[in-house]
């Protein structure tokens, strides 16, 4: 793929209005994408991160190698230590993002060289946009969704099978999370929205959803266990949910979970992980797939067909227009006021020995 123009030919953004969103939510594409996410979640029910499915397919191994390469690309673009101090995103992220975009199609073909050029171009759109926004230096659930759509496309094109679903979460998505934690902490990626649209975490939703399914059959761990630091430390590498709590605790040190993550605190009062897992799917449907500030940036393609009757694609000039054309549910949701990352605030606190607010 030679440039961004080819990316736009392979996939298009089409959800621009509330009417478009209603058509999307009633569409077969919406239903099938949500079913895919639910199937991934069900495939890890009762499994720890290390409980992979055997045998491991060549496609899963190729995806793991791709993610290793992503870490290598990040290593090639270090943050300049003498750069001006800022609590906002590091500009070196743009160099990382530019290289990923330039190599996206080739990286897709490394996963399966038998993909057609058209298929590789489509998949490269989702892979290239799964790491954050290079202009705003931010990351949120829409970028996370792009990675899931990349996996969905590989499944629709026969590269992945349903047998791979467990490992797609426990080997591939877990490794994707590892890469994202590197990018979030290295480049101080800003959260795409003031508190995240859903209020769980500044960046992610799906590790909470998958993690709740992992814990659904656990006899001893309860949702309220997230308030016990020793339990969190013991299980952070075994379950995605506890891994997210551990990350939050490390970067948001100036107050309790109850203060900076009130929705997680509320969820901890639910009686069982089964109820949490059921609620997470409903929440993802409503607060991610059903919210225009996120879905107006969603790409449609041959394997994610556009619903009938939605708006035509915008021109390049319209894409670059003022963000007042976008829908926002809170200030800073999309491409407006930048929000400093909690990682940046935590680092500033460590260096200056006095607390700085992160929101």
UniProtKB/Swiss-Prot annotation:
It catalyses: [protein]-peptidylproline (omega=180) = [protein]-peptidylproline (omega=0). Keywords: Cytoplasm, Isomerase, Rotamase. Its main location: cytoplasm. It is found in: Cytoplasm. CDD domains: PTPA. GO terms for cellular component: cytoplasm; nucleus; protein phosphatase type 2A complex. GO terms for biological process: mitotic spindle organization; response to osmotic stress. InterPro entries: Phstyr_phstse_ac, PTPA_C_lid, PTPA_sf. Its EC number is 5.2.1.8. Transmembrane segments: none annotated. GO terms for molecular function: peptidyl-prolyl cis-trans isomerase activity; protein tyrosine phosphatase activator activity. It is an enzyme of class 5 (isomerase). Pfam families: PTPA. It comes from the Eukaryota. PPIases accelerate the folding of proteins. It catalyzes the cis-trans isomerization of proline imidic peptide bonds in oligopeptides. Acts as a regulatory subunit for PP2A-like phosphatases modulating their activity or substrate specificity, probably by inducing a conformational change in the catalytic subunit, a direct target of the PPIase. Can reactivate inactive phosphatase PP2A-phosphatase methylesterase complexes (PP2Ai) in presence of ATP and Mg(2+) by dissociating the inactive form from the complex. Belongs to the PTPA-type PPIase family. This is Serine/threonine-protein phosphatase 2A activator 2. The lineage of its organism: Eukaryota, Fungi, Dikarya, Ascomycota, Saccharomycotina.
